[in-house]
Amino acid sequence: MEPLDRELDEAELDLPSEPMLLNMGPSHPAMHGTVRIVLELSGETINKADVQIGYLHRGFEKMCERGTWSQVFPYVDRLNYVSPMLNNVGFALAVEKMLGVTVPERCQYYRVILGELARICDHMICSGAMSMELGAFTPFLYLCRAREIFWEIFEEETGARLTHSFGRVGGMARPPTADFKAMVRVGLARVLALVNDAEKLILKNRIFLDRLDGVGQISQEDALALGWTGVVLRATGVPYDVRRANPYMVYDRFEFDVPVGTRGDNYDRFMCRQEEIRQAGRIIEQALEQMPDEGPINIDDPRIVLPPKEEVYTTIEATIQHFKIVMEGIKVPAGECYSYTEAGNGELGFYLVSDGSGTPYRVRIRPPCFATTQGLSQLITGLMIPDVVPTFGSLNMIGGECDH
């Protein structure tokens, strides 16, 4: 056969020209949680993307309405299960808002420190997973080792490494351990050093940068229209952080910056998370300095807080108080409220309705990554198939939170 001296067009080659459908998920290794993405392709270019969520729906809201207010804490742990302490604190603040109570100052600092430790864990695992999905496995191991340091602190304080169920209406389950501050100071220094080491491995890697820079971009207007909050919104240049815009607990006493990006691409989302790790470290250091060494953790109200165990076993009054709170629940005044905090993925909101009984009448959650996931199809349309994984990873979609 004589060699051709010209290029053949598609008609001569008789190649199929219709688009191809490709399923990614719901059980794909790169799908954080269980998500199905149906891609319409021309070659390897994505023409359309249909993102289907809901595979991890567990009826969270209805489960919360079956028990007492205190029995909700194990459920909220399993929303964003990468940073469960932030969920605990968010729900506790919502119920306390309905009760009209404020926890002691020492408890507020304790909540801030534990919450910021959880935020750092959340950001580290998201950044590490993105790195691993792009072929950089070593930084992921560095960041997992860093998370292990904080998990040991959580285990010492709460008894659990991941799902703590440590929050309580009116306070926390227990006061800080004697060496809590020392553990956090030492652990924070080690973690920040590991974060710096992990960054050195990838931030000058040309392959890593090319896969993130300019990929998965979104404008400020589109991000706001989709209801985005958190890192993904700040990466577009909008400096909205609930801790700064509407300070709760003692966040108004801390000096910290709100990292923002400029283009809203994968690289900006990655770098915003890395800088937020350092800002969370600043908050923790200030909170450790300001936190009182003595004082109550829980409010002094027998209608809300369980009595000490030694009193339950020795006095009839404490036994009755314990029995009524456990069996009947805390009597929250009839009404409704919306309370929101800055969780790992953005604004985590709880809309609560009480009929005056010890059981929630209605619990509605505003999960931040539910709104974020709605924008995924817009982000990946026009990209290549390999770009789906790092773009999806940069959004940090957590199945338990999104599907609840």
From Swiss-Prot:
Keyword annotations: Cell inner membrane, Cell membrane, Membrane, NAD, Quinone, Translocase, Transport, Ubiquinone
Top-level EC class as recorded in UniProt: translocase
Gene3D superfamilies: Cytochrome-c3 Hydrogenase, chain B
E.C. designation(s): 7.1.1.-
Source organism, top-level taxon: Bacteria
Transmembrane regions: none
Keyword Lipid biosynthesis: no
Pfam families attached to this UniProt entry: Complex1_49kDa (PF00346)
Function of the protein: NDH-1 shuttles electrons from NADH, via FMN and iron-sulfur (Fe-S) centers, to quinones in the respiratory chain. The immediate electron acceptor for the enzyme in this species is believed to be ubiquinone. Couples the redox reaction to proton translocation (for every two electrons transferred, four hydrogen ions are translocated across the cytoplasmic membrane), and thus conserves the redox energy in a proton gradient.
Family the entry assigns: Belongs to the complex I 49 kDa subunit family.
Protein name per Swiss-Prot or TrEMBL: NADH-quinone oxidoreductase subunit D 1
Organism: Sorangium cellulosum (strain So ce56)
Gene name for this UniProt entry: nuoD1
